[in-house]
From Swiss-Prot:
This is U4-theraphotoxin-Hhn1b. Belongs to the neurotoxin 12 (Hwtx-2) family. 02 (Hwtx-2) subfamily. Keywords: Disulfide bond, Neurotoxin, Postsynaptic neurotoxin, Secreted, Signal, Toxin. Disulfide bonds join 51-65, 55-76, 70-81. It comes from Cyriopagopus hainanus. Residues 23-47 form a propeptide. Its main location: secreted. Postsynaptic neurotoxin.
């Protein structure tokens, strides 16, 4: 009888700890929702700059500005990175 009671209490304690940890993880993920927008904007500006600089370098070397593919679904167009 004591073994069964100890097993039930142990399972209950593990369940409570697991549930609490899962709730804390969910709350921390919800708090970070706004962060990716600012990081994404910085990446967009960086790609725009890299693409326009690479086009300018090609123009100065007496070559036409080719439509280079930027990384991550972006394309170089009119000296700007444009989302494809």
């Amino acid at each position: 009888m004591k073994v069964t009671l100890i097993a039930i209490l142990t399972c209950a304690a593990v369940l409570v700890l697991h549930t609490t940890a899962a709730e804390e993880l969910e709350e921390s993920q919800l708090m970070e929702v706004g962060m990716p927008d600012t990081e994404l904007a910085a990446v967009d500006e960086e790609r725009l700059f890299e693409c326009s600089v690479s086009c300018e370098i090609e123009k100065e070397g007496n070559k036409g500005c080719k439509k280079k593919k930027c990384k991550g679904g972006w394309k170089c167009k009119f000296n700007m990175c444009v989302k494809v």
